[in-house]
């Protein structure tokens, strides 16, 4: 694997610097702003993944078959679902025991960063000399699973932060915290 296919240290550092420091929140406004900042940073990286997929699909449009084009569309749809979940606004109100919830949020945030790093690497591999049909047979399915996992973790964060819509109802498998 080429090093150019990896996420840059600058990108990773910038994302990690935007991770919320939940224990340091002193006001609702501070919590909401920290959330917006982190969510935007995740969204920027997801947008880059989506843009890269679309650019490669456009550049290789004649080489892609209908199934491969369908996979690109499905991946873009998954990214769109994540955007909707990242776009949740509202008052941050941690559910359950604050210490336990903060610990869970920190774990989820780290997993989100690892997934976005892996997703970025997979998307960039599509252009880095990997044969297109091989990428669509192996990497596209892995990327789809990773994006699905990312989406679920995003919704779990929403629940833990008390941020609306699906989160207004109990998170599956969580009767109480």
Q: How should these model regions be labeled?
A:
Residues 51-149:
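Charged linear interaction tracts used for macromolecular binding and regulation
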Residues 38-45, 68, 138, 169:
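Alpha-helix boundary/capping detector
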Residues 132-177:
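Preference for long, well-ordered alpha-helical segments
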Residues 33, 37, 60, 93, ...:
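Residue-level signal for alpha-helical context at structural boundaries
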Residues 1-61:
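Leu/Val/Ala/Ile-rich N-terminal alpha-helices, chiefly Sec-type signal peptides and the beginnings
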């Amino acid at each position: 694997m080429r090093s150019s296919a990896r996420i840059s240290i600058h990108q990773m550092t910038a994302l990690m610097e935007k991770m919320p420091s939940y224990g340091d929140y002193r006001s609702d406004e501070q919590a909401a702003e920290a959330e917006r900042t982190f969510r935007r940073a995740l969204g920027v990286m997801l947008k880059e993944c989506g843009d890269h997929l679309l650019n490669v699909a456009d550049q290789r449009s004649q080489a892609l078959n209908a199934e491969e084009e369908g996979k690109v569309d499905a991946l873009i749809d998954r990214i769109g679902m994540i955007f909707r979940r990242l776009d949740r606004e509202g008052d941050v109100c941690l559910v359950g025991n604050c210490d336990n919830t903060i610990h869970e949020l920190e774990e989820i945030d780290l997993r989100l960063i690892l997934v976005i790093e892996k997703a970025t690497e997979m998307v960039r591999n599509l252009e880095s000399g990997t044969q297109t049909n091989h990428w669509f047979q192996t990497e596209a399915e892995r990327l789809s699973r990773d994006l699905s996992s990312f989406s679920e973790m995003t919704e779990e964060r929403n629940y833990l932060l008390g941020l609306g819509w699906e989160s207004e109802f109990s998170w599956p498998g969580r009767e109480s915290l």
